[in-house]
Amino acid sequence: MKTNNFPKGFLWGGATAANQLEGAYQEGCKGLSLPDVLPGGKERMKIIASPDFDFKIDPKYTYPNHVGIDHYHHFKEDIKLFAEMGFKCYRFSIAWSRVFPNGDEEQPNEEGLKFYDAVIDECLKYDIEPVITISHYEMPLHLITEYGSWTNKKLMGFYENFARTVLTRYKDKVKYWMTFNEINSAAHFPIMSQGLTLSNGAGDKKNIYQSWHNQFVAGAKAVKIGHEINPDMQIGCMILYATTYSYDSDPKNQLATLQNNQANNFFCTDVQVRGHYPAYTKSLLARDGVELSDIDYNDEELDLLAKNPVDYIGFSYYMSSVVDVTHENQETTNGNLMGGVKNPFLKASDWGWQIDPTGLRIALNELSDRYEKPLFIVENGLGAIDKPDENHYVDDDYRIDYLREHIEAISEAISDGADVMGYTPWGCIDLVSASTGEMSKRYGFIYVDEDDEGNGTFDRYKKRSFDWYKKVIDTNGADLA
């Protein structure tokens, strides 16, 4: 890379989620959350997609989220390591069920809030800017089993109470917030963001669209509350973005690619950024067999959306995808996040995710051109099988190569004109995978001695990438060697 395009004040850091690292699932008066009933292992998605899935803990399975990496008892050690790397920011989430154990209480659990007081203060002690996701795949289980999850409009009020509580408490300590993690991911696995699976309504697409609407309105309420509490707060949306290519120049594939982008990348973003439903909404719903009249909404809710768009766009980027509707029996990717036709020009990770740094540059340009808002890459990284030596050292050049190429792509996108706020690679410390419930799928700069069954010393060890990323931050992205 010939020039360093990263602006002064660029937010370098790392990202995690409460349910994937905290553990202590029954400590501090915490209630059960959705991830507490999701079994571990590669069969996780298959099990929870079953029509018989009952949202209960089954003793025949293991539940890695119960333990996480025990960050609940190690957070000071972990944040000290982040500070040693030079983090300017740290993205994490507040577990809803730690603050409101059932989700529908009027008053919060003070013990849960005191934990986050300590986490935030520890970050500020090292001049690390907290970046908080209000809801990250960890809604209270009670809201699913008793209220039917986000199809029920009552959840807007429960979320509003949760958001108001944390936004008020941390109004002078936390500037950057996001409303819902990867809200558009419900198009692929609605259980994680909406609490819906085949056993409780995900088979009917109108439930997904109704849940989205209710989440959009709840998110707009959070934006309104945050700006009223502290006008300097920056509250963003957070989406999963996959750059999408047409297989060829056949107009049918080109049209399918456009519609794929509308459905997967743009719909949820359009509503939250522009403050209104896009012109293609009726057509999009129709493709899923849903009528506008199926959705319960009113003018007051639409007005709330219009008056409270987000301040920035946070997004995850892991891969690109290829759309082909004109050929049968095409080789497909075996990734567990999204399907699609295999791209012969790209390599793939150990989990079949196609590696495409140029796709990140394209994503930043597409989002910048469409929305003209600041962009924050809050997830990106390589999930890999790390093999430590006898001294627990991981020589992860493969991870360094992945990150280097993606950081170069960000720099090039900034040169193209994209307004990029920061970069927080996912799983900066090894944690439990959301999609598979495994520890063996590792992203971190820090190795945690723990296996897929939750056994180990839980000791932390620096990987080779730890010192490399420290150098990247020290030079504000100038030295990627």
Report the location of each language-model feature.
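Active-site region of glycoside hydrolase catalytic domains
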Residues: M1-F53, D58-P59, N102-D104, L113-A481
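Catalytic domains of carbohydrate-active enzymes, especially glycoside hydrolases
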Residues: H74-A95, K307-I313
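Active-site mouth loops of central-metabolism enzymes
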Residues: K60-H74, T151-K154
